[in-house]
Amino acid sequence: MGIGKFACRKLVHDRKLYRWSDRDYARRVLRLDEKADPLEGAPQAKGIVLEKVGVEAKQPNSAIRKCIRIQLIKNGRQITAFCPGDGAINFIDEHDEVTIEGIGGRMGGSYGDIPGVRFRVFKVNDVSLEEMVAGKRDKPLR
């Protein structure tokens, strides 16, 4: 490989070519993570609650984490979302409209001992779930 005065064109060409060997570069440029993401790259999304589900915690913990299955309004995809807070699941009923966000796991993945759950609920019918759990606000009737 040339390193002379006029070798710049070849060096740039080779760099562009070998860039594609880098897996992270290829995924970023082809936007593969965005295409696979149910939220389509957005930070938040709204959905309709289909059912309440209990997800068993991974070893060594023993618990049933309260989650919900929701169908996203924007694209119809179904996902599972975690309901954080003591008794938070009691404020969520079927057919409610919830707003979700990422749960905060590494590289957009799941968090802690909840397997396969990448999202969490933070609003129910446009009211903060945290405020409802704390008793500051009541759940509105839709």
Swiss-Prot record:
Family assignment from sequence similarity: Belongs to the universal ribosomal protein uS12 family.
Highest taxon of the lineage: Archaea
One Gene Ontology term, aspect cellular component: small ribosomal subunit
Subunit structure: Part of the 30S ribosomal subunit.
Keywords: Ribonucleoprotein, Ribosomal protein, RNA-binding, rRNA-binding
SUPFAM superfamilies linked: Nucleic acid-binding proteins (SSF50249)
Function according to Swiss-Prot or TrEMBL: With S4 and S5 plays an important role in translational accuracy. Located at the interface of the 30S and 50S subunits.
Recorded GO MF terms: rRNA binding; structural constituent of ribosome
Disulfide bonds: none
One of the GO BP terms on file: translation
InterPro entries per the UniProt record, alphabetical: NA-bd_OB-fold (IPR012340), Ribosomal_uS12 (IPR006032), Ribosomal_uS12_arc (IPR022863), Ribosomal_uS12_euk/arc (IPR005680)
Keyword Ribonucleoprotein appears in the UniProt entry: yes
This protein's encoding gene: rps12
Family annotation (PROSITE patterns): RIBOSOMAL_S12
Protein name per Swiss-Prot or TrEMBL: Small ribosomal subunit protein uS12
